[in-house]
Amino acid sequence: MKEEETTYHVPVLLKESVDAMNISPDGTYVDVTFGGGGHSREILSRLGDGGRLLGFDQDEDAERNIVNDPHFTFVRSNFRYLHNFLRYHDIGEVDAILADLGVSSHHFDDSERGFSFRFDGKLDMRMNKRAGITAADVVNTYEEERLADIFYLYGELKNSRKLASVIVKARTGQKIETIGEFLEIIKPLFGREREKKELAKVFQALRIEVNQEMEALKEMLMAATEALKPGGRLVVITYHSLEDRMVKNIMKTGNVEGKATQDFFGNLQTPFRLVNNKVIVPDEDEITRNPRSRSAKLRIAEKK
C-alpha cells in the first residue's frame, strides 16, 4: 500500500469491492470516490491495454493522489455530475461503477477542514473548499425549524428541536464560528456516556447538509443506473443508514424511494439483479487494522 493511501485514506473492503466489479482487462470503469486512490490503483492493476478508468473527486486535496497511468482520467467534480462527464469524455456505457461513500480519513484528521469534533478550528465541513456554504453558515443563518429538521433527518437525533433551540439562542449574542464555540453550546445537552456518539450524529447531519450529500447520491445513483451496460456492476460501500437505505432501494426497485413498479402483467420492473442478498462487511482483521471500516456495508447489483 502506498504512503499517500495510508495518510489520506485507507481503502475499505478493497479486494471484496474490486472483485465485485468483475473487471475485464479491456473494460471501462468508474471510481466515483477517488480519495486516496486505493481502489483506483487496484482497478488499474487489473486492466489491460484497452482498459479505461475514470476517477471522480470534488476535493482539490485528492488531486495530489492522482495515478500516473495512461488508462486513468481524473475528473475533479462532484459525482452527481457523472452523466455529464461521461458524455464529455465520449463514454457511452460502462462495465462497472464503484462508490465508497465514507468520508476520507484525511478530512477527519485535518483540523482546518472542520469535519471532526476532536479538533478546534473553523466550522467548515465543505468537501469542495471553493464552493457552497459552510457549517458555520448553517448554524448561524438557518431558521430554528429547518435546523431541527436537519438534525432529525440527517443525524436521527431525538432531541433535534431542543438542539436547534439552544443553537438559535446562543447565536443571537455572538456568531458561532469555531468548533470549540459550537461544542460549548451543545455539549451540555448530551450525557457523558453517549456524548461522543451524539456529537458524531450532530456533525454528520451538518456535513450532509453542507455538501448536499443525499441529493448528490440520488443523482449519482440514477445516472449510474443509466450508464451501466447490461451485465455491468454497481458496487457501493455505505456507512450510515440514510445512504444505505437509498442504495438498497435503487438496487431493489430502480429508484431511491424504494417504490416497486410493475408492468402490465404485474411483473416487478427493476433494472438490477442483486449479486449479494446479504451485505458484505469487513472482517475482524480489517476492523482491527482500520477501525473506521467498522460500519461499512458493501452492496452489489448487476444491470439486467
Curated annotation (Swiss-Prot):
InterPro entries: RsmH (IPR002903), SAM-dep_MeTrfase_MraW_recog (IPR023397), SAM-dependent_MTases_sf (IPR029063). It holds the Pfam family Methyltransf_5. Its EC number is 2.1.1.199. GO terms for cellular component: cytoplasm. It is found in: Cytoplasm. SUPFAM superfamilies: Putative methyltransferase TM0872, insert domain, S-adenosyl-L-methionine-dependent methyltransferases. S-adenosyl-L-methionine binds at G37, G38, H39, D57, F79, D100, H107. The keyword Magnesium does not apply. GO terms for molecular function: rRNA (cytosine-N4-)-methyltransferase activity. It catalyses: cytidine(1402) in 16S rRNA + S-adenosyl-L-methionine = N(4)-methylcytidine(1402) in 16S rRNA + S-adenosyl-L-homocysteine + H(+). Keywords: Cytoplasm, Methyltransferase, rRNA processing, S-adenosyl-L-methionine, Transferase. One of its GO terms (biological process) is rRNA base methylation. Belongs to the methyltransferase superfamily. RsmH family. PANTHER family: 12S RRNA N4-METHYLCYTIDINE METHYLTRANSFERASE, S-ADENOSYL-METHYLTRANSFERASE MRAW. Specifically methylates the N4 position of cytidine in position 1402 (C1402) of 16S rRNA. This is Ribosomal RNA small subunit methyltransferase H. It comes from Bacteroides fragilis (strain YCH46). The gene is rsmH.
